[in-house]
């Protein structure tokens, strides 16, 4: 079996996690208490969904996941929520005091006390796997727990499970909407370790997803639940081929191979189509070319950056539902002829496609319409650098005055770490610039950087 362990860190990670597991359970017909009426082979772990769920002898299906937070309120909601019987109590780990939006608390003081317990739980989950494939890590880098404890856990996972792939779903601060003043500090410090310790990181940002909800679903005031359900569709599409059998399966390590041209250039944009409300879907059925064009639209991107400002290095298209390879090839051929979607000159083909016949599921009473076919795109585009330069700019404004730095130093950080992380990000921006530059032949002498 090729199992995947999901790790949800901090409030954002946990709430996205709730949406994801809710959707997985719906897709597999697993009840809220973990029973699965359709599973006839009780205790036999060869079903495809066992990549994400382990089965007990009594026929209960338990998610291979842990939820970690430094303060209890968010995890208590899981403990008392609709899916409380789904998770093993040991999988829900909460501390007593908050990271207070402070990377240093999450990484050094408060996080240090809880990280061994987390790794112990991960070890238990890993021992339960026959062929662990990798980890999905969910966190936000604006707060303290997601950024600090997230980085710490990733660093420790690299030590314990060096060869396993780690995919991050990371919520980055939005350009306009901010939930904390020190977001730029936390993001820069955290990205410093994401660079080192994740194999692929998918960037999400709330503002972009708010806009998609407003525009495509006509929700005037989207809540986090609306956002998370949209995010969970993307994550579900990414992992469909691990959980169901399909025509062209896409493995987690395949994402890495196909999307990451250089180890550091691994920050991805994602988009999903069709995002339509039930009222609209009732009157229109979208074809493969239509949804394929939709995922390349700048307005469908789940992070605030414009792919037209950059070039694509690679992209993965995961189709699900009523889709045949012939349609996909035709749609991709059309995209290639379009001048709007530009690829770097050293990577002319750039498309990886997966098809899965399991149609997309939707949460009953949710906002998304039930559709026959959907597509999710994960793309590596040089425009992602916009996200970093925006955060770096805000970081510089504050750091020039050393504003708020004492809170970090007081928790045992050194000021040098700020400048080190900032330099690393400056180098990353430069890397993206070089990768997108015309003509790859003149860069032969700079191969040592990677």
UniProtKB/Swiss-Prot annotation:
PTM characteristics: Undergoes a tyrosination/detyrosination cycle, the cyclic removal and re-addition of a C-terminal tyrosine residue by the enzymes tubulin tyrosine carboxypeptidase (TTCP) and tubulin tyrosine ligase (TTL), respectively.
Keyword flag Protein biosynthesis: no
Cofactor(s) required, per the database record: Mg(2+)
Highest taxon listed in the record's lineage: Eukaryota
GO cellular component: cytoplasm; microtubule
Catalytic residues in the record: 254
Catalytic reactions on record: GTP + H2O = GDP + phosphate + H(+)
SMART domains recorded: Tubulin (SM00864), Tubulin_C (SM00865)
Residues annotated for GTP binding in this entry: 11, 71, 144-145, 179, 206, 228
UniProt subcellular location: Cytoplasm, Cytoskeleton
Site residues by UniProt (Involved in polymerization): 450
UniProt-listed Enzyme Commission number(s): 3.6.5.-
Pfam families membership: Tubulin (PF00091), Tubulin_C (PF03953)
Residues bound to Mg(2+): 71
Summary of subunit composition and partner proteins: Dimer of alpha and beta chains. A typical microtubule is a hollow water-filled tube with an outer diameter of 25 nm and an inner diameter of 15 nM. Alpha-beta heterodimers associate head-to-tail to form protofilaments running lengthwise along the microtubule wall with the beta-tubulin subunit facing the microtubule plus end conferring a structural polarity. Microtubules usually have 13 protofilaments but different protofilament numbers can be found in some organisms and specialized cells.
Role played: Tubulin is the major constituent of microtubules, a cylinder consisting of laterally associated linear protofilaments composed of alpha- and beta-tubulin heterodimers. Microtubules grow by the addition of GTP-tubulin dimers to the microtubule end, where a stabilizing cap forms. Below the cap, tubulin dimers are in GDP-bound state, owing to GTPase activity of alpha-tubulin.
Protein name from the UniProt record: Tubulin alpha-1 chain
Organism (species): Hordeum vulgare
Classification of source organism: Eukaryota, Viridiplantae, Streptophyta, Embryophyta, Tracheophyta
Gene designation per UniProt: TUBA1
